[in-house]
Amino acid sequence: MLSLFSVVFTFLALFLIPGLFISRRLNVPLSLTNILRFIKIIASKYDDEEERNEKRGTMGEKQKRGRNIMPKHVAVILDGNRRWAEKRGLGTSEGHEAGARRLMENAKDCFAMGTNTISLFAFSTENWERPEDEVKCLMALFEKYLASDMPYLRSDKIKISVIGNRTKLPESLLGLIEEVEEATKSYEGKNLIIAIDYSGRYDILQACKSLANKVKDGLIQVEDINEKAMEKELLTKCSEFPNPDLLIRTSGEQRISNFFLWQSAYTELYFPTVLWPDFGEAEYLEALTWYQQRQRRFGRRV
C-alpha cells in the first residue's frame, strides 16, 4: 500500500508542478481538466513523432535497398548539343564543347554511385555525313579531353576502351587512343567505353566475319557458334559487363539510333527531355530512381 507521502509526491510530480508551469506559460486557469488535456496533447504529439520516425525508417530501408539495385552498366546516347547551343544563340562548336565538358563530370557521378561500366555514344558512323567543320571540331574535342582527363583516369584507375571503326580517324587521335588504352589497360572495376565511329550493325557484322574466319581456319566448328561465342567477338568484349542494364538518351528522342543493337535486348530504355549539356547529377539520380522502380523480367514471368 502506498504511503500518504508517496501519493502526495506523485500528485505533485505528475500533476501540480506541470500544472503550475502550464498555467503560467499558457495563461490558462489551473485545473485538473486542463492538465489532463495538456497531457493528452503531448501524448498525441509523441505518437505522431513515433509514426514519422517509423516512416523515415521505412523510406531509409527502401533507399538502402535501392542502392543495391544499381545498374552495373549504363550506356548513354549524348544527344542535344546543337539544340542546346541554338537555344542560347551560340554556335554548334560551343554546344559540342559544353557537351564534352559534361561527359567526364557525368562519368564521375556514375562511378561514384556504384556503376562499373559506362558507355558513351560519342560519334556514330552516320555522323560522318555532318558538315566537315563540325566533324573536325568533334575530332579535336576528342583529342583535347582524352589528353586533359588522363590524370583523373590514372588517379581513379579507370580503364578506357574506345570502340568503333578506327580506319577513318585522324592519325593524331588514333595515337592518343592507343596511348590512353595502353596506360589504363590493367585497371579493374571501372571501365569507360567511348564509342567513336560506332554502329551496332557494323559491330554485329564484324563479329560474324570473325566467327566465319575462325570456322574457315579450323579454329572452331559451326556447332560452336552460340550467343556466348558471338558476345566474345563483339566490340563490348572489353567490359566485364558487356550488356547495358540502363540506356539513357537525352533530348527526348526515343530511339537507339544503331547503338548496341545486340547488347540492348533486355536493357531498360530511359528518354529524358533534358539536353545533354544540361544533364547533371540531379538528372542522373532521377534516371536511377526510375530504373530502380522497374521490374526486370528478362522475358520470364515473375
UniProtKB/Swiss-Prot annotation:
Membrane-spanning residues: 2-22
GO CC annotation, single: endoplasmic reticulum membrane
UniProt superkingdom: Eukaryota
Pathway listed: Protein modification; protein glycosylation
Family of this protein: Belongs to the UPP synthase family.
Primary role: Catalyzes cis-prenyl chain elongation to produce the polyprenyl backbone of dolichol, a glycosyl carrier-lipid required for the biosynthesis of several classes of glycoprotein.
Designated name of the protein: Dehydrodolichyl diphosphate synthase 5
